[in-house]
């Protein structure tokens, strides 16, 4: 599977809205364009036109990754993904795995701490170690879905990247690197203190991220209400 940057954004938005605003899903072209161009929870922020989103939908339809839905008394065509977790999909993800894939599609490379703090509306992780285990599982499948990037200078955590929207050679290189990744250790009660100390700086960062996410969620809630008003236009 090879997605362009725009196609990855479209799939990410459909995955996100299916979970966070199920009453407004599937999405009309207008609503999907607004979702793609959200100022919050997107990196990079885009300014796609409806024509560009429609072109991406057409290509995704050829790849059998989206489908149209119409009727029910409305003339507006709406779109839903077939990317994963449907009877037509080869990919089947748990709620935890889906949340991480969605975030990586929408926001690019991220650390486990960032993913934990940003995933609350999609899936609730109780600890960073749960995110790490999930990422490890996604990196070790027959066809790896994520890969661990080299640690940036002066950074504690590695960042992870999704492998659906990147070049084959790059993906193979990154995937090969993850084969040498050791599975994260599950913390035991007897070592809880050491684990907590190990993640102390990550938790401080997570607290700051949480405050930012509260503001982002308020913005996202307002955007969701706007999508609801425009979904039938």
Swiss-Prot record:
Residues 178-198 have a biased composition (Polar residues). Residues 178-204 are annotated as: Disordered. InterPro entries: DUF480, WH-like_DNA-bd_sf, WH_DNA-bd_sf. Gene3D superfamilies: Winged helix-like DNA-binding domain superfamily/Winged helix DNA-binding domain (1.10.10.10). Belongs to the UPF0502 family. PANTHER family: UPF0502 PROTEIN YCEH. This is UPF0502 protein Sden_2282. It comes from Shewanella denitrificans (strain OS217 / ATCC BAA-1090 / DSM 15013).
């Amino acid at each position: 599977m090879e997605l362009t940057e725009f196609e990855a954004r479209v799939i990410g938005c459909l995955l996100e809205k299916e979970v966070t605003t199920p009453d407004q899903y599937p999405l009309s072209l207008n609503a999907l364009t607004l979702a793609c161009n959200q100022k919050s929870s997107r990196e990079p922020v885009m300014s796609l036109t409806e024509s560009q989103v429609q072109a991406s939908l057409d290509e995704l339809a050829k790849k059998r990754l989206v489908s149209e839905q119409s009727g029910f008394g409305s003339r507006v065509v709406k779109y839903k993904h077939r990317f994963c977790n449907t009877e037509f999909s080869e990919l089947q993800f748990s709620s935890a795995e889906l949340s991480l894939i969605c975030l990586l599609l929408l926001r690019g490379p991220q650390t486990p701490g960032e993913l934990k703090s940003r995933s609350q509306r999609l899936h609730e992780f109780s600890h960073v170690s749960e995110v790490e285990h999930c990422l490890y599982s996604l990196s070790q499948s027959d066809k790896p879905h994520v890969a661990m990037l080299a640690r940036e200078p002066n950074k504690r955590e590695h960042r992870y990247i999704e492998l659906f929207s990147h070049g084959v050679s790059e993906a193979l290189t990154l995937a090969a690197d993850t084969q040498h990744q050791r599975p994260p250790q599950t913390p035991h009660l007897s070592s809880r203190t050491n684990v907590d100390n190990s993640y102390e700086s990550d938790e401080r960062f997570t607290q700051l991220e949480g405050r930012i996410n509260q503001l982002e969620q308020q913005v996202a809630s307002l955007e969701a209400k706007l999508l609801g008003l425009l979904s039938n236009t």
